[in-house]
UniProtKB/Swiss-Prot annotation:
The record marks 216, 271 as: Important for substrate specificity. Substrate binds at residues 234, 258-260. This is S-methyl-5'-thioadenosine phosphorylase. Pathway: Amino-acid biosynthesis; L-methionine biosynthesis via salvage pathway; S-methyl-5-thio-alpha-D-ribose 1-phosphate from S-methyl-5'-thioadenosine (phosphorylase route): step 1/1. It comes from Aspergillus fumigatus (strain ATCC MYA-4609 / CBS 101355 / FGSC A1100 / Af293).
Length: 342
């Protein structure tokens, strides 16, 4: 589990590339290329990168979108990437957003989750694969293992805006199964892409989402273990809840970096420990996301990627008749769901 506010300087040592390393004029020109700020086609799949996955090298960057929503601006520009599938050479557009900002300057409680989800939906996104570094709460989930959670326990403290439906309109959406099982099945089937001695993909688990940015106390860590918690992070919520409200199929992929502080045979979690495992996880994360995108791009998953199974679901959660919506709430929801309301 990560103390994100203290990672900023440490992260820069892995990401900064001095100009002296650029060995040719061609390379320099490439780094200075300005990407278009528009993209005309709908983009159905998005990857939200957290600590440990801040970029997707090997994909072709084709646009960089700066979008302003009624809930503000997202945490980073949305990069549109082209991915060429390995099995059929099909080119798939993917949106990439960095949850904590381009320079990892946004703490977990400061992430503009509503703007992130709204901006992605506005360009056509209906499926999100979200990555997050996590602490392990169980012996069998080792550092460098991956986990596909199927449940979450909310331990945030109410300081993060968590709904699109407020200020004159009320809606209650089901959240009994917080992740999309259809997308999860596709993701689990891609575990073969992970490499490294002893690396395991755990296909289910309960994720504890805590407030942060501080680490857990030992008592808290043991409490979460007693609840059956598998892993812990600071990023899943309200991201997953907002995706559900926005009718987007959402699945998180967790990358274990440490045993939190409950494990008596290891030292307490430190930034250095986390970053060592994170660096090892990064290459596996890129292999994994490539395999997942290949699978999602197949024709058999076309309806899944477009989230046809959740389309229209928010209308059943509305508690406020449209005639009674406030003008401000209506304007925001019409931006999020254009042409959706009577």
């Amino acid at each position: 589990m990560l103390g994100f506010s203290s990672l900023r300087r440490y992260l820069s040592s892995f990401t900064t590339r001095p100009l002296r390393r650029i060995e040719s004029a061609k390379q320099l020109a490439k780094t200075m290329t300005v990407l278009p700020n528009t993209y005309d086609e709908p983009v159905r799949i998005a990857v939200i990168g957290g600590t440990g996955l801040r970029e997707l090298p090997g994909f072709t960057q084709v646009a960089s979108l700066s979008i302003t929503t009624p809930w503000g601006s997202p945490s980073s520009p949305i990069t549109i990437l082209h991915h060429q599938c390995s099995h059929n050479n099909k080119t798939v557009a993917v949106a990439f957003l960095s949850r904590h900002g381009t320079h990892h300057q946004i703490a977990p409680h400061e992430v503009p989750a509503r703007a992130n989800i709204a901006a992605l939906r506005s360009i056509g996104v209906r499926t999100i694969i979200a990555f997050s570094a996590v602490g392990s709460l169980q012996e069998e989930i080792k550092p460098r293992d991956f986990v596909i959670p199927d449940q979450v326990i909310d331990r945030t403290k109410g300081v993060r805006p968590w709904t699109f439906f407020e200020g004159g309109v009320v809606a209650h959406v089901p959240f009994g199964d917080p992740f999309d099982e259809g997308v999860a099945k596709v993701v689990r089937a891609c575990g073969h892409s992970l490499e490294g001695e002893g690396v395991v993909l755990h296909d289910r688990g309960t994720l504890i989402c805590m407030e942060g940015p501080q680490f857990s106390t030992r008592a808290e860590s043991n409490l979460y273990r007693s609840w059956g918690g598998s892993v812990i992070n600071m990023s899943c919520l309200p991201e997953a809840k907002l995706a559900r409200e926005a009718e987007i199929a959402y699945q998180m992929i967790c990358m274990s970096t440490d045993y939190d502080c409950w494990h008596e045979s290891t030292a307490d979690v430190t930034v250095e420990m986390v970053m060592g495992h994170m660096k090892a996880n990064a290459q596996n994360a890129r292999r994994f996301v490539t395999a997942v995108l290949d699978a999602l791009a197949s024709d058999e998953h076309a309806d899944l990627v477009q989230a046809k199974h959740v389309e229209g679901s928010i209308k059943f959660g509305l508690s406020t008749a449209q005639a009674n919506w406030s003008p401000e709430a209506r304007a925001k929801l019409e931006w999020l769901f254009p042409g959706y309301w009577n």
